[in-house]
């Protein structure tokens, strides 16, 4: 499936501007009608769990700056719906609640996106200053001032203006981020170009990142989280799970010979035949074929690099081979 040429481009701005139509909903505690509640993710990565407890299964990550809807509450946990949409529970310290007007103002505000793998927000324009927050690739914050000082209400030295950018966290706290770690979001979104080279280069930034079920950030990723993160940073918004990702784009039209045993000498030749149909940048899906008694099941996804190699998240993000007999097969 060659997503680069087959699926329509959905700019990452959808993650920010995704909104929920104003309506009335039931208050999760009182059961009475109330206005819908919204929030913006305030942690660099907020862990989304199946149930309101730390022992519950991790199902997704929500990155800083993502707009969510609050649909439930239990103790210090909030049940949210993310733009995907994905419903899960998060720690309420990682959210900044907003009403409709506040949300409109937030969405309209100019923003930066973190394009470095990792960064920090400092209390002063100095790398040795107190750290207000960490940041990861894909995090979004509002612009306080730009490198030319525009928007700043405090006096900055020329050196600091050149080295740091002023940001406003979702909580409203103001801080400073090294200039090279951020880009103006609107300009970044307009320049995304999901070429094969860009996809592969972004994927390789994740090499060595640990596997985590439900992970979708450079801190830790599962297989579909890797694919989703890579395409997001190149301007394409993929579905969250591998089984959903397998339904977008076009299937590769080839006819593998499944009668050949994987332990036979002929299997290597068969695999090379299958590989000949692939192009770098294709998504590869692994799982079980449909039978008379069961449906097809997709359980893993990887990104094809070319030459029989692919990159995927399995224990860690690593490069493996499709060719039987290779050390990394």
Residue ranges with predicted function:
Residues 24-36, 66-67, 82-113, 117, ...:
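Boundary regions of SH3-family modules and the immediately adjacent low-complexity/disordered segments
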Residues 31-34, 40-70, 114-155, 211:
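Beta-loop motif signature
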Residues 1-9:
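Bacterial N-terminal signal peptides that target proteins for export
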Residues 8-18:
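Bacterial N-terminal signal peptides
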Residues 203, 215-234, 238-241:
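Active-site nucleophilic cysteine motif
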Residues 128, 185-190, 210-218, 291:
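Second-shell loop/turn segments in exported
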Residues 97, 119, 126-132, 295-329:
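Aromatic- and glycine-rich peptidoglycan recognition patches
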Residues 239-319:
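...with weaker cross-activation on analogous glycine-rich loops/strands in unrelated enzymes
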């Amino acid at each position: 499936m060659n997503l680069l040429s087959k699926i329509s481009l959905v700019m990452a701005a959808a993650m920010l501007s995704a909104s929920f139509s104003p309506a009335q909903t039931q208050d999760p505690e009182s059961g009475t009608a109330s206005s819908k509640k919204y929030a913006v993710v305030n942690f660099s990565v907020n862990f989304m769990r199946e149930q309101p407890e730390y022992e519950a299964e991790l199902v997704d990550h929500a990155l800083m700056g993502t707009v969510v809807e609050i649909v439930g509450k239990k103790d210090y946990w909030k049940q949210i719906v993310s733009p995907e949409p994905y419903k899960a529970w998060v720690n309420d310290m990682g959210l900044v609640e907003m009403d409709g007007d506040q949300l409109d103002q937030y969405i309209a505000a100019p923003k930066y996106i973190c394009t470095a793998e990792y960064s920090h927000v400092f209390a002063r324009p100095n790398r040795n200053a107190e750290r207000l927050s960490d940041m990861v690739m894909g995090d979004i914050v509002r612009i306080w001032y730009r490198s030319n000082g525009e928007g700043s209400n405090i006096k900055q030295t020329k050196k600091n203006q050149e080295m740091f950018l002023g940001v406003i966290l979702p909580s409203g706290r103001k801080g400073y981020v090294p200039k090279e770690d951020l880009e103006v979001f609107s300009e970044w979104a307009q320049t995304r170009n999901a070429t094969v080279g860009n996809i592969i280069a972004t994927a390789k930034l994740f090499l060595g990142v640990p596997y985590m079920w439900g992970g979708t950030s450079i801190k830790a990723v599962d297989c579909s989280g890797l694919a989703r993160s890579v395409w997001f940073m190149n301007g394409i918004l993929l579905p969250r799970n591998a089984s959903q990702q397998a339904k977008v784009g076009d299937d590769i039209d080839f006819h593998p010979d499944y009668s050949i045993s994987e332990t036979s000498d002929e299997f290597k030749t068969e695999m090379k035949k299958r590989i000949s149909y692939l192009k770098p940048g294709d998504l590869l899906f692994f799982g079980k074929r449909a039978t008379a008694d069961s449906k097809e099941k997709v359980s893993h996804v990887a990104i094809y690099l070319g030459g029989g190699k692919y990159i995927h998240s399995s224990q860690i993000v690593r490069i493996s081979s499709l060719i039987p007999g290779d050390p990394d097969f």
